[in-house]
Amino acid sequence: MKTAALGMALALAAGAVLAGDQQAHNTLTAAEKAAGWKLLFDGRDLNGWREFKKTTIGPGWQVKDGVITLVDPAKADDIITTDKYANFDLVFDWKISKNGNSGVYYHVIETGDHGYETGPEYQLLDNAHGEPPLQQAASLFGLYAPSKDVTRPVGTFNHSRLVVDHGHVEHWLNGVKVAEYQIGSADFKARVAGTKFAHWPLFATADTGYISLQDHESVVAFRDIKIKPLK
């Protein structure tokens, strides 16, 4: 009995240590702060964001239980950061509804009617929806397909990373690098030329711009949005 009790006590102690080591959502560790990371979402409100070409955010976007959720696409638009970013390392968690579709744009400028006219898109998708590879989760939408599907089951959070460094871009999903490209390269330009993006002359031309969360008529949720500006 004493041996069993001791074993139980040790197990509980180990669990407490693990729980203590688990970082709270929407926070930065001391090491992250020292390395230059900053939060784009603090888990409480949408300060630091606004809708595209607006100064406010409609009721379709809500914050609850430490998560940004697009709950009513009919009452929302794409939201963008209030600050612009050039070169950066961006991480975020996201989950999508069944058959859902969304995305994260970068280097968005407020020219034209929509963010996708200027900003490349890190695609977010329920891959079970059956879209082609160029439109699957973690693709550069319409241009570069992910090398593999490492998405988690719909309704659970995925972890994404987007690195933009002087035109060299990496897409990561759940710890795996799945796409890599160079904006402005011959290959990139050739791919753009064969798509709808060719109709927008400012697409992927800005060296700096806003980061945007897409309203694509699907329920989507975000948390742990962090960015580290790069030189």
Label every PLM stretch briefly:
Residues 18-231:
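Carbohydrate-interacting regions of secretory-pathway proteins
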